[in-house]
Design a protein with these regions (language model features):
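N-terminal export signals
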Residues: 5-21
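Non-catalytic cap/lid and distal C-terminal segments of serine-dependent acyl enzymes
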Residues: 22-312
């Protein structure tokens, strides 16, 4: 894969707006258009309600997912959809997961900066920080994006839909840069989110110069040092929160293994065991929606393992 193709993959990488119904394979999909924020750019938000939502008074856990336009509907997706509604409808019918409300937070043209963890950038050596910020078009905007999620969007969702509002019932997930901000969300706001599923997490932050050799080795070592320090110092206490990571070994994912292995060690050294931490390799999987769709049952089951239903 050439440099231009890798860059294109990485860059696929816009208060309460008007709501309108969308089409879902099952359940009900509602689009809240142009949701304004004091902390982040205005964007659409899609909310998927599970089958049976309108026929009962049950309250539901909530899964927040980034890149919301790619989750449910191929007509709004840039590179194919995840099929979240299809996967969850089948898993719910088989009693494999709890029935969640899924909040799909659409990205904007500031996606890369909104998903770039500010703590990591602050921990980088100055020259690396400058290089990353030049690639991304400016400093991280993740603090404002997370404030939008926790201080504006979550109260709106909890006030509009029948949700279970506590952290034990609130999860977050994303892919690539969305994996980074999902992990950061649990670390920064463990009082809001109890679990994160991070697919094809984009640990290297950039794609330039990632061909094997001395430059990759030097970049990786300095970056892993920053990552491990930030993660070790920011993890919630063991026993209260959960983290899922995965990766393929093709296209952009081919660069993640050496990062992920080292970072997995930080979680294990902190005491995160199999019930609280999972890191999986899917051989042959690429860095795209088709691959994430193909294995989505695994992180969904990790996040939403069954427990008794609660009602109002």
């Amino acid at each position: 894969m050439n440099r231009r193709s890798l860059l294109a993959l990485a860059a696929a990488l816009p208060f309460a707006g008007a709501a309108r119904a969308e089409t879902a394979a099952a359940g009900r999909l509602v689009l809240h258009e142009a949701m304004a924020s004091a902390h982040a750019k205005t964007r659409n938000v899609s909310v998927w309600l599970p089958p049976g939502y309108d026929a009962s008074d049950a309250r539901h856990p909530v899964l927040y997912m980034h890149d919301g336009q790619n989750l449910f509907d191929a007509s709004t997706a840039n590179f194919g959809e995840w099929g979240v509604d299809e996967h969850l409808t089948r898993l719910i019918a088989g009693d494999q997961v709890r029935a969640p409300i899924v909040v799909g937070v659409w990205n904007t043209d500031l996606r890369l900066r909104e998903y770039l963890p500010s703590d990591l950038i602050a921990a980088l050596p100055a020259e690396m920080r400058d290089e990353v910020q030049a690639i991304y078009g400016g400093p991280p905007l993740s603090v404002g994006y997370l404030r939008f999620l926790t201080d504006e969007l979550k109260p709106f969702v909890d006030g509009t839909y029948r949700t279970l509002t506590g952290p034990e019932d609130t999860m977050i997930s994303g892919s690539s840069m969305g994996g980074l901000i999902s992990m950061q969300a649990v670390m920064k706001r463990p009082d809001v989110f109890s679990a994160a599923a991070c697919l094809s997490t984009h640990w290297p932050l950039k794609v330039e110069g990632l061909e094997p050799g001395p430059r990759l080795d030097a970049w990786r070592e300095r970056l892993v040092t920053a990552w491990t320090g930030v993660i070790a110092g920011g993890l919630p206490p063991v026993g209260t929160h959960r983290f899922y990571f995965d990766r393929g070994d093709e296209t952009l994912d081919q660069f993640y293994g050496q990062f992920q292995t080292r970072i997995d060690g930080v979680f294990r050294e902190a005491g995160y065991g199999p019930g609280r931490f999972q890191s999986l390799l899917f051989p042959g999987a690429q860095h795209n929606e088709a691959s994430w769709n193909g294995r989505l049952d695994v992180p969904l089951t990790f996040l939403l393992s069954p427990r008794p239903t609660q009602t109002s």
